[in-house]
Swiss-Prot record:
Main location: membrane
GO cellular component: plasma membrane; proton-transporting ATP synthase complex
Gene of this entry: atpB
Stated name of the protein: ATP synthase subunit a
Alphabetical list of HAMAP family matching this protein: ATP_synth_a_bact
Membrane topology type: Multi-pass membrane protein
Family: Belongs to the ATPase A chain family.
Domain of life: Bacteria
Pfam families according to UniProt: ATP-synt_A
Localization: Cell inner membrane
Bilayer-crossing regions: 38-58, 100-120, 146-166, 220-240, 242-262
Function: Key component of the proton channel; it plays a direct role in the translocation of protons across the membrane.
């Protein structure tokens, strides 16, 4: 469906549709009649998240190979500032001993930032190319506005939380943490298990949904501006919102990184 023939409601709905693959038939899903099934894959979210992850690796590897001890270039300086900032954050917040945390925090911060940054592209640019040049029925370009991506990343963090908890405290110590806190008496084990279980499970859920909610709302505002206002007046709201959104993009990447460090630091504490 060409965007110029859409009503505002159809335009907004079209831009909120993902390019989906039905894993049962390996055929593209019709965005106008999507099946209510678990067995669908959001191809666009997967594609852009992988591409941006590879871009991160290529950029940082290139800078690492060309790094000089002399006066660095602007790009090398920017990368060094990011690395120094993340390293300082990990040093301040993580009190355990692990060589994995700093690279993990750096990866999360830059990767989430790049995914968020896609929200600043013109809302119709890549969807127009995908529809008119590639014949794709729908395309969304902001991976972090897809709850499947954010919850998948949060699930990875959750697995690391469990790993470090068991590694540092042992299975017995981890079990005691779940069953003997906050009430240190065997009679309260069921209550403790419920309280600690909810607290533990809420970490990845809140981590993923916070990022998704903020980025989805930001994307939706851009779509509303483009879909409801005439083209000649869109810049009046688009430019201020884009400038403000730069802060949101950076802040959400920072929050995701910080909470990951804090959760892993809590998991690594020995009691």
């Amino acid at each position: 469906m060409a965007s110029e023939n859409m009503t505002p409601q159809e335009y907004i709905g079209h831009h909120l549709n993902n390019l989906q693959l039905d894993l049962r038939t390996f055929s593209l899903v019709d965005p106008q009649n999507p099946p209510a099934t678990f067995w669908t894959l959001n191809i666009d979210s997967m594609f852009f998240s992988v591409v941006l992850g590879l871009l991160f690796l290529v950029m940082f590897r290139s800078v690492a190979k060309k790094a000089t001890s002399g006066v660095p270039g602007k790009f090398q300086t920017a990368i060094e500032l990011i690395v120094g900032f993340v390293h300082g954050s990990v040093k301040d917040m993580y009190h355990g001993k692990s060589k994995l945390i700093a690279p993990l925090a750096l990866t999360i911060f830059v990767w989430v930032f790049l995914m968020n940054l896609m929200d600043l592209l013109p809302i119709d640019l890549l969807p127009y190319i995908a529809e008119h040049w590639l014949g794709l029925p729908a395309t969304r370009v902001v991976p972090s506005a897809d709850v499947n991506i954010t919850l998948s990343m949060a699930l990875g963090v959750f697995i690391l939380i469990l790993f470090y908890s068991i590694k540092m405290k042992g299975i017995g110590g981890f079990a005691k943490e779940l069953t003997l806190q906050p009430f240190n008496h065997w009679a309260f084990i069921p209550v403790n298990l419920i309280l600690e279980g909810v607290s533990l499970l809420s970490k990845p859920v809140s981590l993923g949904l916070r990022l998704f909610g903020n980025m989805y709302a930001g994307e939706l505002i851009f779509i509303l501006i483009a879909g409801l206002l005439p083209w000649w007046s869109q810049w009046i709201l688009n430019v201020p919102w884009a400038i403000f959104h730069i802060l949101i993009i950076t802040l959400q990447a920072f929050i995701f990184m910080v909470l990951t460090i804090v959760y892993l630091s809590m998991a690594s504490e020995e009691h």
